[in-house]
Every structure is written in structure tokens, then in C-alpha cells.
Amino acid sequence: MAVDSRMDLLSERAVLMRASLQKSQTITDNVVSILGSFDSRLSALETAMRPTQIRTHAIRKAHENIDRTLKAAEVILSQFDLLRQAETKVLKGPHEDLESYLDAIAQLRKIIRYFMSNKSFKSSDGVLNHANSLLAKAQSKLEEEFKQLLASYSKAVEPDRLFDGLPNSLRPSSDGDGGGKPHGGHHNDDAETAAYTLPILIPSRVLPLLHDLAQQMVQAGHQQQLLQIYRDTRSFVLEESLKKLGVEKLSKEDVQRMQWEVLEAKIGNWIHFMRIAVKLLFAGERQVCDQIFRGFDSLSDQCFAEVTVSSVSMLLSFGDAIARSKRSPEKLFVLLDMYEIMRELHTEIETIFKGKACLEIRDSATGLTKRLAQTAQETFGDFEEAVEKDATKTAVLDGTVHPLTSYVINYVKFLFDYQTTLKQLFLEFGNGDDSNSQLASVTMRIMQALQNNLDGKSKQYKDPALTHLFLMNNIHYMVRSVRRSEAKDLLGDDWVQRHRRIVQQHANQYKRVAWTKILQSSSAQGLTSSGGGSLEGGNSSGVSRGLLKERFKMFNMQFDELHQRQSQWTVPDTELRESLRLAVAEVLLPAYRSFLKRFGPLVESGKNPQKYIKYTAEDLERLLGELFEGKSMNEPRR
């Protein structure tokens, strides 16, 4: 029963479900029918709308094209506007507002580039022509502004301003010499390390303006115009500065015609001028050039070379004329001074005149240094030969130190003030030997050449005693001078001792030659009695009074003659003079005292003894003290 009821219920539900499905199918069929109807309508609508879509796309593209055209037109119009602005600034000129003027030129270049890349515009050619014409005008004004600005601030430097830049030790003295220190103070170690203050050639505020102008000219391709303007302006000013300082343009012929005193002064000035020119003027010029042409190194070097070449040539040509002039001993020291300054300035010259463009200038400076060194060496060699061959007829009648001796010794002593330079010469241009030994060797040869010449000059004396006195004086002067100078360290003690012995030998020879005869007159030798007997053992009883009187007369005559002659002779050195007098007295006075003691009584016992015994030993000693004083012939005895 229960099962049947469940089956009935289940059957009813199946009927309901079938009815629902059928209804749902009907709805689905209806929906499909409706959707199909919509699809047909939509297809028809799409077909109807297609022409409208095409027209809309075309309109959109047209709008985009219009936008692009408007934007391009705006750019073109802006370029025209910028061109008008640039033209206004260009026509106004760069003088009042250089920065704005340079901006206008930069803008013109951009405008030209723009129209060059957009030549499709109808007006592009006309605009380009106008812009290029405007740019050319702007650059011309720029060039003129550079020229005027550079000229306005380029003035010759007054000497006082240059002197202010020197270290105190190198400034001219306040007595108005103006030409600087003489070359005699030749080598100053402080000069190489002292601080120099560069003169202000162009105000620092102007340099950036000149740099900007130069940069624009380079960018415009006007390097040659720039170079010419800068060279003409600055080279003229530099030469004027040197002329105000005292530098002259002198040819070799001018130098050769000058008197030595005048030339020597000019050489001293030249040394001072070289130091000022290199360390102040050329260094300052390089600094200015590098700042104006910053970023254009090769152009900077070229400009600097062309600005300075004439001034450098003016200075070096004088040095070259001296180096090539006829050699003479007195020129050696100025040649060494000139060589020293060129060596002192070598580092600065290499630094200031850097770069390929300045190569010729550097080579010229190096060439002058070498020529000065070579000429100095040759002059040094000439001096040795000149000393040995000196044939001056200067007579030294009193046997004193010959002018040649004092000249040579002073020359050698002066050389030792330059020994550092001479050693450098031997080191750089010698044969490789030690520079000390080379200097010593040359000095010894000069001294030997002097001795050889003095030997020749001594033969002019007819009196052999004066010959030895002359050689004694001169060699003693050499020895004394060497002992008191740095030459002693170079020549050595052996040289000094050897030549002291030579001095003593000549003193001994003088004494022997001059006083032997009178010593014989004051000896007992040759005194015999009237009977022919000889004097023996100090006994004077057999001596002929007449012969004895003659012997005294002979002594008096000989002494008078010796005194008169030798009191006119000169021994200039006090110590040597006293020692020579003492040496004569030591042999003459004992002999005379002995002779007078033994034979004086015989003469005194006769008539007029004072006629024969003219001198006491004390008289002789006093008169010997008058020897070698260089008295005139008519000067009375004391």
C-alpha cells in the first residue's frame, strides 16, 4: 500500500517535470527566434553605418594633420620671432651687453641649423640668407669688439712696475741708475729661487670677455683673423715695454763699432733685461695668452710664439753678436755672466716657450747658450796664449811688479769668482775629465805662461841684479796672491812652496850679483905693502897706506853708486823689502865693521881721514834702510 502511494507520487512528479521541460523548450525556441531577428537587424544596421565610420576616420586624420601643421607653423613662427630678437641684439652691437650679444649669435646659429634641415618650406632660402647675413655682420662686430677691447687694455709696462716685480736684491738702486745691476755681481744663487711678481698685463676682469670673444671667432672659423689681431696688438705692446726698459735693436756691426767701456755697460744691462723679460714679461704674456685661448692649446701656443718671436730675437741677437765678436781676454767675464744668465733662465724658457710652435725660439736660446760657452772656452784658451806672448813695451825701470803680473793675477783671482760656472763649462763642453782638475790645469798653465813671459821681460834689464829683483818681486806677488785666494786650494801647497823657493833663489842671486864687488872692497884680500909683502893674520903694519886709501875710496864710490841706484828700485811688499835689506846688512855690515876696525886707524892717522873714511857702520845701516823705496834720482838722502 505504501509502495503504491509512493509510485503514484513519483509518477505525478515525472508528469510535472515533463510539462516543465516542454515549456522551457518552447521558451528557448522563442528566445532563439528573437535573437536571430536581432542579429539580422544588427547586420543591417552595421551595413548602414559603415559609410559613416569611414567618414569619421577621415575627419579624425584631418584633425591630426591640422594639429601637426599648426604645431609646425608655431615652431616656424617662433623661429621668426627668435630671428627678430637676435637681429635686434646684433644691430645694437656687443659693447653694452656682450653676454646677450653672444646669446644672440648662438641663437642665430640654431636658427640657421633649423632652416637648413627644413628646406621644404618655401621661405627657408630667404630666411637662411637673412640669418647668414646677420650672423656674418654679428661676427664682424664681434671681431671688431675683440680688437678694440684688446687694444684698450694693452698698454706698455713702465719700467718701475717691472722693477717692483723683482726680488729686492735685483732691483735697481735708488740713485737712478735705471738700467739694473751691473754684471759684476755676476752670479746670485738667490736670483734663481727668489719670488717674482708678474705684472698685470691685462685686467683680470677683462680676460673672460676676451676669452668668450676669441671662442666665438674660433667657432666661426676666423682663427687667422684672431691670430693676426692678437699678434699685432700684443707684439707691439711687448716691444714697447722692452724699449721703455732700455732694450735696443743692435746689429752685429753696431756691436763691433762700440768702445769696450760702452759695450761692457750694455752687456750688464742686457743680463738684467733678459731676467726681466723672461721671468716677468714673457711669463706674464704666456699667462694672458693661456687664459684668453683656454681650451685651444695649439692656437694659444701659436699666438704666444708669434707675439714674442720679435722681442726674443731682439734680445738674443745682441747676445749672439757678442758671442760672435772678436775675442779678447777682457770679454771672458762678461761672456761667463751671459752664459750664467742663459743657464739660470733655461728652465723658465723651456716652460714658458712650450709647444711645437715655440720650438724655434727654444732652439735659438739653447744655441746662444752653447755659443757663449764655446766662445768663453776659446777666450780662456786665448788668454793663456796672450799671457805668454805678451810683448808690451811697458818699462818697469824700478824692478817692481809688472802691470802684466797684476793684471794676470787679478784675472785669475776674478776667475775664481766664476769657478762654479767654469766647472759647469768644463763639465758640459769639456773632454770628460774632472772639472776641478781641468780648472787647476788651466790655471797652472796660465801661471806658467806668466812666468815664461816675465823671464823674457827680465832680460831687458842691463843690470843683472835688477833682473833678479824684478823676478823676485813678480813671483813673490804671484805667490802671495795665490796664498790669499781660493787659488791656493786649487794649485795646492806644493805649487806655493816651489815658488817660494824660486823667490828666495832670486833674492840670493840679487844679493850675490849686486854686493859681491863691494864686499871684496871691504875685505883684506889684495892689500899688500910697498915692498910687496902681503897682509897676514890681521897685522896691518905692512899695508900700504896709499893702497888702503884707494880701497876706502873704491868702497865709498861703489856704495854711493849702489845706494843711488837701488834706492830708486822698488820692492813693494813691506815684509819682503825689510827681509832683503836685512839680508844685505847681514853680509855688508860685519865685513865693513871688521875692515874699518883693522884699517881705519891707519887712514885716520894720516891727512884728511874723512876724505877716505866716509861712512860709519851705523851710516851704512841707515842708508841701507833707504833701499828699494822707489825714490826719484834727485830726491835727497834722509
Swiss-Prot record:
Belongs to the EXO70 family. GO terms for cellular component: cytoplasmic vesicle; cytoskeleton; cytosol; exocyst; extracellular region; phragmoplast; plasma membrane. This is Exocyst complex component EXO70A1. It comes from the Eukaryota. SUPFAM superfamilies: Cullin repeat-like. Its main location: cytoplasm. Pfam families: Exo70_C, Exo70_N. GO terms for molecular function: phosphatidylinositol-4,5-bisphosphate binding. Disulfide bonds: none annotated. Component of the exocyst complex involved in the docking of exocytic vesicles with fusion sites on the plasma membrane during regulated or polarized secretion. Involved in polarized cell growth and organ morphogenesis. Involved in polarized cell growth and organ morphogenesis. During cytokinesis, involved in cell plate initiation, cell plate maturation and formation of new primary cell wall. Participates in polarized pectin delivery required for the polarized development of the mucilage-producing volcano cells of the seed coat. The keyword Cell membrane applies. It comes from Arabidopsis thaliana. InterPro entries: Cullin_repeat-like_dom_sf, Exo70, Exo70_C. Residues 163-190 are annotated as: Disordered. Disruption phenotype: Dwarf and sterile plants with decreased apical dominance. Branched inflorescences due to ectopic initiation of lateral inflorescences instead of flowers. Altered polar growth of root hairs and stigmatic papillae. Reduced cell expansion and aberrant xylem development. Aberrant deposition of xylem secondary cell wall (SCW). Keywords: Cell membrane, Cell wall, Cytoplasm, Cytoskeleton, Exocytosis, Membrane, Secreted, Transport. The exocyst complex is composed of SEC3, SEC5, SEC6, SEC8, SEC10, EXO70A1 and EXO84B. Interacts with SEC3A and EXO84B. Co-localizes with FPP3/VETH1, FPP2/VETH2 and COG2 in vesicle-like small motile compartments. May interact with COG2. It is found in: Cytoplasm, Cytosol; Cytoplasm, Cytoskeleton, Phragmoplast; Cell membrane; Secreted, Cell wall.
